[in-house]
Amino acid sequence: MELINFLIEHFYFSAPLVIILILFFISNSKKGGTKISCQSLISLSNQDQALIVDLRSSEAFNSGHITASINIPLNDVSRRSNEIISSTKSIVLVCEAGSSSTNAGETLKKEGLKDIFILRGGINEWKMSNLPLV
């Protein structure tokens, strides 16, 4: 309650701060692509509407990956972007924890791709949700 009173009493100082914070969160939420949950990825995959791109190393991919995903390690995204861009499906980027996918998404956006999704929490979130890997 005190915080609300402070913000109201100091409106001219607090309003710009609140606006900056909101803009920061909005810009980061779309950076690299739209973040989606594991359940949303399952829905896209079940409808055969997603190309799932696993950005982890080949070793990590071979030790367990999401069904029907392809492996394009993060370092190869620029070089192999034509494989991704040629897809008519939505692109879902998956990495270990979700942060590398943002960088790859930015790279693909620069190449002209628009329909990009990022698995929130990456493969770690997938495992914590007890979802299967092959």
Q: Residue ranges of each PLM-predicted region?
A:
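Rhodanese-like catalytic fold shared by cysteine-dependent sulfurtransferases
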Residues: 1-38, 47-50, 58-90, 99-134
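Conserved histidine-centered catalytic loops in small-molecule metabolism enzymes
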Residues: 41
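Active-site flanking residues adjacent to catalytic metal/cofactor-binding acidic residues
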Residues: 53
